[in-house]
């Protein structure tokens, strides 16, 4: 699993101090919850981040040209874009400046906890990984 974020975000600082993380997903229709745990690998200004950047759409790249870091307090609701880019897509040259802030985070999964919610009884399982290979699986009491 991978995600993109701004190098200036607080989560990057936290992951640099401790690269362990958990993510929780829930599908209401299927009544399935997934808790995924693993270790984050941060890519900024390297081959992996460049490839991800080059594959991103222009509107996605626009997120990384904001002047202030994500989470910066403001007295009013703001997008963070300069006025001239508020409603328009900047040129490719301007968008390229966002690459400095763009970061790819790869998650190396260590475990997946699967939970199926049902009124007649829940079901729960645990899958454990090592070096991206499934090494153990089994049922748990919900």
Give the residues covered by each predicted segment.
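A short mixed-secondary-structure module that forms the rim of ligand-binding clefts
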Residues: 1-31
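Charged, gly/pro-rich active-site loop segments
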Residues: 33-142
């Amino acid at each position: 699993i991978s995600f993109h974020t701004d190098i200036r975000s607080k989560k990057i600082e936290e992951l640099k101090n401790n690269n362990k993380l958990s993510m929780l997903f829930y599908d209401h229709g299927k009544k399935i919850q997934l808790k995924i745990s693993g270790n984050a690998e941060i890519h900024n200004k390297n081959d992996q981040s460049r490839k991800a950047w080059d594959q991103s759409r222009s509107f996605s790249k626009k997120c990384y040209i904001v002047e202030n870091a994500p989470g910066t307090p403001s007295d009013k609701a703001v997008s963070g874009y300069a006025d001239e880019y508020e409603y328009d897509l900047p040129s490719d040259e301007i968008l390229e400046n966002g690459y400095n802030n763009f970061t790819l985070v790869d998650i190396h999964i260590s475990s997946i906890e699967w939970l199926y919610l049902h009124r007649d009884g829940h079901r729960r399982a645990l899958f454990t990984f090592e070096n991206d290979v499934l090494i153990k699986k089994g049922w748990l009491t919900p």
